[in-house]
Amino acid sequence: NQDQFYPGGLAELGNPYIIRDFRGQAVQVFPLQYNPVTQSLRVYTSITVHVYATDEIGENPLNRQGELQTMISEYKSIYQHHFNNYNNFMNNRYNILDEEGSMLIISYSSFMDDLLPLVEWKNMRGLKTTLVDVNDIGSNSSAISQYVEDYYYDENLAYLLLVGDIAQMPSVTVGGDPSDPSYGFIEGNDAYPEVMVGRFSAESATHVQTQVERSINYERYPMADADWYHKGTGIGSSEGSGIGDEGEADWQHQDNIRAKLMDYTYTEVDQVYDPGANSGDVTTAVNEGRSVMNYTGHGS
């Protein structure tokens, strides 16, 4: 232990990152400083932080070709809630038009016909959607990643749907584990997605048909005044303290996600955390109706 206050600074900048249309940087503020030798705690009630631009290129430069003309509507909503200065930044710009972008569905060969109703529906509602057989791309994640990257630049890709279980549709491997979202990390070396990635996990045509039918019904027949649209569930283990995201335990990470959801449009987010959580809590939540479920922890 050293006779000094930690952390030494009151604020610091994180590494620059790219999230599709913008380059961002997080500012971390430390209103508490602790000296372990004197056991003294400093508490700052007011801190002013000045952030200045420099002429250096820095990490993860965003090489935009010309001025931004259009923006994916869903990403615009993300930007508004992600960047503290988004509205001020955009007020000094011309009007940027909303657009849908495009959707790419990569499927295991045996499920191609079962996906046609979904492709037809997506195109009918105005989202340009293309269905591709994974065998026409390549059977490994490197070939798929390159195809997705090329499609992103050529077709303004916004949504990627993988169809099939991992034995039929490989995932990107990160740290020895599969990571579907990594297919969406196109720009920079960060973990902020340029493309939203999902998967229909399926071992049979029946599995695919069920998910296709439910997806179409969810979009085509929205339920008026259904409160479950604004309810979610968070599931977290008691592990991970000190080694998780920003040193959080799994349940703390879920609580942070919960706070963001409650600050958005959600009215209720279940806290199914260890110790004490059980599968019955999850079953009850699902049967009552939830629009999103998040899990942080290890499988066994």
Predicted features and spans:
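Cysteine-dependent hydrolase recognition
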Residues: 1-300
